[in-house]
Amino acid sequence: MSENYVAPGQQRYLRACMVCSIVMTYARFRDEGCPNCEDFLHLQGSPDQIDSCTSQVFEGIITIANPQKSWVAKWQRLDGYVKGVYATKVSGQLPDDVRTTLEDDGIQYIPRDGSATEAD
């Protein structure tokens, strides 16, 4: 997990994806995109999209080494995502056009800010 290491002076550049809640630096989102959501968010190389779909305001950090076997990953709805560092709560709202794209692609968006719960 050394690829997720953030130097002490770099924490202020951390952002969390509003869809999957992975936490990375702004530069990593810019250079690599979101490892879970890039197919539909298109963050790589797009500062406007990064600003719209990630947030600097998040709470709690958990590290998931094996998302398929972790009960914490299941509890946080992270099973199926890549291993990494995730926020437990991400503040902010996705733009309407991004939400529409998710719906059109058949992806159920559940806000990570605690404002909605998963429908059973």
Curated annotation (Swiss-Prot):
UniProt xrefs under SMART domains: Spt4 (SM01389)
Cite the residue ranges of zinc fingers (C4-type).
17-37
Does Transcription appear among the keywords? yes
- What are the record's GO terms for cellular component? chromosome, centromeric region; DSIF complex
List UniProt keywords, sorted A-Z: Centromere, Chromosome, Metal-binding, mRNA processing, Nucleus, Transcription, Zinc, Zinc-finger
Source organism, top-level taxon = Eukaryota
Disulfide links within the chain: none
Q: Name one GO molecular function term.
A: zinc ion binding
Its localization reads: Nucleus; Chromosome, Centromere
UniProt cross-references to Gene3D superfamilies, sorted A to Z? 3.30.40.210
The GO biological-process annotations, alphabetized, read as: mRNA processing; regulation of DNA-templated transcription; transcription elongation by RNA polymerase II; transcription elongation-coupled chromatin remodeling
The record's Pfam families line, in alphabetical order, gives:
Spt4 (PF06093)
Subunit structure as annotated in this protein's UniProt entry: Component of the spt4-spt5 complex. Interacts with RNA polymerase II.
Similarity comment: Belongs to the SPT4 family.
**What is its biological role?**
The spt4-spt5 complex mediates both activation and inhibition of transcription elongation, and plays a role in pre-mRNA processing. This complex seems to be important for the stability of the RNA polymerase II elongation machinery on the chromatin template but not for the inherent ability of this machinery to translocate down the gene.
Q: What is this protein called?
A: Transcription elongation factor spt4
Per the UniProt record, the source organism is Neurospora crassa (strain ATCC 24698 / 74-OR23-1A / CBS 708.71 / DSM 1257 / FGSC 987)
